[in-house]
Amino acid sequence: LYKPDTHEIILHNKNFKTDEELVYTAVHEYTHHLIAEEQLAINGSAYMPNAKVHTEAFWVKFHSLLKIAEEKNYYSINIDSVPELKELTENIQKNYLEANGKLMQEFGRLLSKAHALCEKANIRYEDYLDRVLCLPRNSARDIKRVGQISDIDPAIGFDNMKMISTIKKSDERAKAQEQILSGESPVTVRSLMKQKCQTPDDPKQKLEKEKNRLAKTIAQLQQRLDYVEETLASM
């Protein structure tokens, strides 16, 4: 448990069977502390803890700290020590993640073919998706995009294939794919992808954007409050 108001980390040792579990949880709570400290440095005393604490930024920092803990031999996730789990993991990776990735690649190619045939027959492809295949359009778009890119390794699994297929440059796709194959978490890879696409805001611009966003939200809430009060008054 992390208490942002007092900056305290509380660990109950009876909740853990091994040191590995204790270290994992300690790193988790320490990540909350670091995120809170960063926000305090940016926003000062005006900082208020967000209700949503497990953000993408949190998981990226958490996984980076876990890597440091592994490098220093404080923590490890050693599935080799559990033969049954190792065998099951290999089965999942080969016969489910990779097999499903291959299947979805082929699915994407078939959707491209169906799109072309719909256009040839003067049939709206969107209607074909909606009422013949009953497939959500966003899902069809993602699957089709995966099928159009041949240099993605199905071994990373379909969800990661979808993410990497949004990268336009093949060399950057290859780098992102290699990161996943080497054990980087998808959320870390996604964050790195975003960093390359975005120019960092300076602190003032960031606060101005937040101010505008909050002002808009307050205006909408005030409008709703006025409506509710008027409705109550007329009852």
Regions found by a protein language model. Give the residues of each.
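Catalytic zinc-binding patch centered on the HExxH motif and its immediate surroundings
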Residues: 1-8
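Short pre-active-site segment immediately N-terminal to the catalytic Zn-binding motif
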Residues: 9-26
